[in-house]
């Protein structure tokens, strides 16, 4: 039982004993005591006034006397207006530190056989181009959210839906047939996703040229500019061929399907490299080429049950006007599906594969309305988690102007960004002398850890709902609210512990109850103890930024302590041992906290 749990239980017993009434746990509000007052935790008395029928100060005195007399964790108390400030006994702090020291995952809840199953969808790439900066934010948020939900005692399934069909894929395929001369990732020396992305760009280039030529021709024939452009886009031989290829794909044409599979396989190999470099992955991958058929079938079942309706043109719709929304198209008049149909199909396949209790979609905020509708439709179709599905909505991420422009000058490839971050981390680390006495292999590994840590932390520390500007230079600063600052602090702690070991100092598993503790050491234990609450809150709010903020606050607290107090040069052996145990647990908590963000920490720097 934690110190907070002990106090809550004793406070509930106090109200029962003193005022003869049972109160729920949520009525007992504990908060950290403000720095200008004596104490460690403060009990808010106001919720009990209707029960005590006394003044706030008198109620606080009653509760304070009872809690001090009945809880070994409390050394003393004082009352400030309606607030009861509790001074935690030094032995209780040492006991808490021992508890932390004995638990490698202190602050996290274990996953059990009966834990609820949470499925998290993220990434959702198209197979006609490489992953870009927007995908980076999506993948980092999804991966971190999965770690946080697991740390809150949930079983987690990480999933990806790949948009592997449609006109955009056919454009890349057609361009490769026309202009590729049999080029492959091996012959070109390019990753498969980059190669296919180049052919998507090539299609667009040739298509624009065709439209320009046709538009000029139609205008010369007397057509106005707007009508000429519209007709040119429709009559372009390239776009017609792409649509013909899509029809053949849907008809299972063997040649088209073989080409589609070959080119998609190149892309998947490229994606896998990017995911590996980014340190993310999935437990189950779904493909739109499978799910859209399931979605069509599910919509037709809903139609037969009267959940949806068919219009005169044969299209199928859902009427959501009773929910304050509009009518939603589910199948076009020619029977082809829309994105909503595919999402219904994907949901059906997942529901059949896993006993899902909660479904979280990590998708940009431009899709807010889509998921509002999907939630209603899934609920009507009988998915138990439909009504409660979570759309983890996030904002756009951009780079400062002139930073890392891509070949098209608009979108930054994830691979280019990762390589640039690792390169910048290596250069900055060399300039700051962080690579002293390291081999080239060790330098490259530290650069990888720091570069990716800088990228991930800078993105994840921002509230996901907000648009953000990612500044590569700011992210690699070894001071301030950055990944490298936290990583360097962890490496410093590991260095201290190695020096202690070299001096023959053994860090004990348990501290005796009479070991010395000063106020600053108690503050550090209290900050360590807040990790569990930070993990729980991050799980409730779906907020990786809450974990990032906690790691930064703990890092600042340790660095201030280390500035004020020597660890290995402490005045007494007992002080040295206590501080080494403290440092060890700060390091462990930083490592665990950063792992929830998908960030590695280096053992040395």
Regions found by a protein language model. Give the residues of each.
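Short, charged, solvent-exposed linker or helix-capping segments at domain edges/interfaces
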Residues: 95-100
